[in-house]
Structure formats: structure tokens, C-alpha cells
């Protein structure tokens, strides 16, 4: 089986440094970022530009499921695992959008928050989440990022 490899790593991996954890970036993302909404998920995104060659990846993401929407921790954790896996399978769309090899994209970083907004009655399947993440990521246009 042939796996695509990017910079010595598998394209579909989700590395630890790709997870958005900085509180200031997260706060700025929710205050000044743009958003798009699907049936189960809401995606916030914003670009940042750094003058200095940053060691952070071109795209960083966070996943959140509200305790209010999903009161049981086991269900919240399962949804976050499904969301991470769906993103991991579809993230190549964003890496082609933020291709670090293109000079006009130099120093541009994209932060994304994927929030579960569906109800607690029934949870979406992995395939539905994957399709919705793909659709939402497709809504992020290059013209909005440059």
C-alpha cells in the first residue's frame, strides 16, 4: 500500500504541534475570526502573518464539544476523536491552500476551531462528520486568506 509522504511525515497524520493550544490565539480566533456553519459543526478560522520565520505549522486546529450540548464525558470524547479523525483525513485541502512552497503564502498561518453544535439526541456518523468538515474547509477561500 502506497502512502503519500510530506517532509518525511505521513500527510494524514495529526502531529502534536498542529493542535492549537495558545490561549491568546484561541481568544483572537473567536473574537476576530470568520466562521462557517454546517448541520453538526461550526468552523472558526483566521489567518495570522508573522515576519519572523515561525516554527509553528502553517495550519493549527482545535476541537471542542460543549458540555451543555453533550453532557456525558464519554460521548464528548468520542465526538472529539471522530472530529479529529475526520479532519486528519481531509486536512490535505488546507495544506494545498496554505502551501508553504509558494512565496505569497510565506509567513501566513491559519488557525481553525472546529466546534460541535449538534444536539445530544443522536450523534452523526464518522462519514457525515468527514463530509461536513470537507465542505466547511472548502468554504475557506484562498482570496479570504491572502
Swiss-Prot record:
It catalyses: Endonucleolytic cleavage of RNA, removing 5'-extranucleotides from tRNA precursor. Belongs to the RnpA family. It comes from Chlorobium phaeobacteroides (strain DSM 266 / SMG 266 / 2430). Its EC number is 3.1.26.5. One of its GO terms (molecular function) is tRNA binding. The keyword Glycosyltransferase does not apply. This is Ribonuclease P protein component. Consists of a catalytic RNA component (M1 or rnpB) and a protein subunit. The keyword Kinase does not apply. SUPFAM superfamilies: Ribosomal protein S5 domain 2-like. RNaseP catalyzes the removal of the 5'-leader sequence from pre-tRNA to produce the mature 5'-terminus. It can also cleave other RNA substrates such as 4.5S RNA. The protein component plays an auxiliary but essential role in vivo by binding to the 5'-leader sequence and broadening the substrate specificity of the ribozyme. It holds the Pfam family Ribonuclease_P. InterPro entries: Ribosomal_Su5_D2-typ_SF (IPR020568), Ribsml_uS5_D2-typ_fold_subgr (IPR014721), RNase_P (IPR000100), RNase_P_CS (IPR020539). Coiled coil: none annotated. GO terms for biological process: tRNA 5'-leader removal. Keywords: Endonuclease, Hydrolase, Nuclease, RNA-binding, tRNA processing.
Amino acid at each position: 500500500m502506497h502512502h503519500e509522504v510530506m517532509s518525511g511525515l505521513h500527510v494524514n497524520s495529526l502531529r502534536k504541534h498542529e493542535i492549537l493550544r495558545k490561549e491568546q490565539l484561541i481568544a483572537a480566533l473567536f473574537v476576530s475570526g470568520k466562521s462557517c456553519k454546517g448541520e453538526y459543526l461550526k468552523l472558526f478560522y483566521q489567518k495570522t502573518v508573522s515576519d519572523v520565520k515561525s516554527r509553528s505549522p502553517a495550519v493549527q486546529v482545535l476541537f471542542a464539544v460543549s458540555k451543555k450540548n453533550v453532557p456525558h464525558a464519554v460521548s464528548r470524547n468520542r465526538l472529539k476523536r471522530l472530529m479529529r479523525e475526520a479532519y486528519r483525513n481531509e486536512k490535505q485541502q488546507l495544506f494545498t491552500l496554505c502551501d508553504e512552497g509558494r512565496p505569497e503564502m510565506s509567513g501566513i498561518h491559519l488557525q481553525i476551531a472546529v466546534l460541535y453544535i449538534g444536539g445530544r439526541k443522536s450523534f452523526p456518523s464518522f462519514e457525515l462528520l468527514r463530509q461536513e468538515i470537507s465542505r466547511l474547509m472548502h468554504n475557506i477561500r484562498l482570496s479570504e486568506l491572502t
